[in-house]
Swiss-Prot record:
It is found in: Plastid, Chloroplast. Belongs to the universal ribosomal protein uS12 family. This is Small ribosomal subunit protein uS12cy. PROSITE patterns: RIBOSOMAL_S12 (PS00055). Part of the 30S ribosomal subunit. Coiled coil: none annotated. The lineage of its organism: Eukaryota, Viridiplantae, Streptophyta, Embryophyta, Tracheophyta. Pfam families: Ribosom_S12_S23. PANTHER family: 30S RIBOSOMAL PROTEIN S12 FAMILY MEMBER. Keywords: Chloroplast, Plastid, Ribonucleoprotein, Ribosomal protein, RNA-binding, rRNA-binding. GO terms for molecular function: rRNA binding; structural constituent of ribosome. With S4 and S5 plays an important role in translational accuracy. Located at the interface of the 30S and 50S subunits.
Length: 124
């Protein structure tokens, strides 16, 4: 416990909270342009798959790596996408997700369950 004299000499420092998605600059989503769409990246040790990711240049000026969720996608080099926060646990350095069903990223084809997460309208 500090004395009054110590508190006068130097005040208490506020706790700085570090954001997990700095490229979004406090916004819920950001628009960006794909600079490169990687066909596949392999995950960390216990898992095995071919995950789809893309390099995206955001309107905030950051160049990030974003995960493309769902089965199949139509993204190419100059596609305009919407990016949200949210990391992929088994891909190091991937801290953002591309929002499906908005801008140039179409929804997942033939999706029946969990449709809102993949930009799919209710089937007739």
């Amino acid at each position: 416990m500090p004395t009054i004299k110590q508190l006068i000499r130097n005040t208490r420092q506020p706790i700085r909270n570090v954001t997990k998605s700095p490229a979004l600059r406090g916004c819920p989503q950001r628009r960006g342009t794909c600079t490169r769409v990687y066909s596949t990246i392999t995950p960390k040790k216990p898992n095995s798959a071919l995950r789809k990711v893309a390099r995206v240049r955001l309107t905030s000026g950051f160049e990030i790596t974003a995960y493309i969720p769902g089965i199949g996608h139509n993204l190419q080099e100059h596609s305009v996408v919407l990016v949200r926060g949210g990391r992929v646990k088994d891909l190091p350095g991937v801290r953002y997700h591309i929002v499906r069903g908005t801008l140039d990223a179409v929804g997942v084809k033939d999706r029946q369950q969990g449709r809102s997460k993949y930009g799919v309208k209710k089937p007739k």
